[in-house]
Every structure is written in C-alpha cells, then in structure tokens.
C-alpha cells in the first residue's frame, strides 16, 4: 500500500517540508509564462490566530535577485545526503523572505508533506531567524520566532 502524503494541516510542525504549487498571489515571482510553480516550503512558524503558516522556500539555485552579500548570507545549504527522499541535489533554503500561506489554501492546493528538516538544520535555521536583522521584531513575533 502506498503511503499517502496528503497533508493534515492541524498536525504540521516547525521544520516540516511541504510540496505545494505556489503562484503570484502567494508572493512568488513567476517567469517564462508559468501560472504557478511546484515548490518545497519549510514551515518556520504559525500566525497567532492559527490560520496561516510562515514558510521559507527551498531552491535548487540561489536566485539572481539574492546575490547581494546580505541576502547571500540568508541562504542556508540543504545537503541532498540528509534529504535523499526529498531533494535530487544540494539546495538552498532562502531565509531572506517569509511567505505567509493559509493552511486552507495549502490543503486546497493538495500540498503534500514530504518530510522534515533534520534537527541540526532546524536548530540552525531557527537560530538564524531569531538573530537576523532582515526581519523586524513584529515579523518575528507574528510567527513565534
């Protein structure tokens, strides 16, 4: 029997990796005529009212718009050896931009739970997010960082 990946948003936790189509309405910048793109996101927090999550994107390459020193320092490497069931190659977790996504929308778009950050990566990413000046205190507080 094939293990279902359909996501139960009530049980999602920090560090979970979800595969979901995102579009411009979600804050994604789309190129080449795409209406949406399937993306891996990592949950890094929840809004106080509990209806939305704060998420970071996993990218196979660092986007050209993130090449300044400040934004390059916000790219966290995810090694394929730690995520063989999820990633096909070493990738980058973009810690410079938090996407707020409603739990309902992730469910409606058939988001799939693919796994979770390994504890070491989760701790380092959350520590970075707590200490970075890229996000103001209000943003950090909104997602419980």
Predicted regions and their residues:
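Mixed-charge, Lys/Arg-rich low-complexity intrinsically disordered regions
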Residues: 1-12
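Short acidic, S/G/P-rich loop/turn micro-motifs used as interaction or catalytic elements
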Residues: 25-26
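Compact nucleic-acid interaction/catalytic patches
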Residues: 29-38, 43-82
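C-terminal terminal-subdomain/extension
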Residues: 71, 75-145
């Amino acid at each position: 029997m094939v293990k279902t990946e359909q996501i139960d948003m009530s049980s999602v936790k920090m560090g979970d990796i979800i595969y979901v189509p995102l579009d411009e309405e979600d804050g994604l910048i789309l190129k080449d005529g795409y209406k949406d793109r399937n993306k891996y996101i990592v949950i890094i927090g929840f809004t106080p009212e509990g209806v939305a999550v704060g998420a970071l994107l996993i990218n196979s390459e660092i986007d050209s718009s993130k090449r300044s020193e400040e934004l390059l320092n916000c790219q966290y490497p995810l090694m394929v050896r730690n995520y063989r069931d999820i990633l096909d190659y070493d990738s980058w977790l973009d810690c410079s931009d938090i996407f707020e996504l409603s739990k309902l929308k992730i469910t409606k778009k058939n988001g799939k739970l693919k796994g979770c950050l390994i504890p070491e990566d989760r701790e380092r990413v959350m520590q970075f997010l707590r200490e970075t000046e890229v996000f103001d205190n209000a943003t950090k507080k909104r997602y419980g960082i």
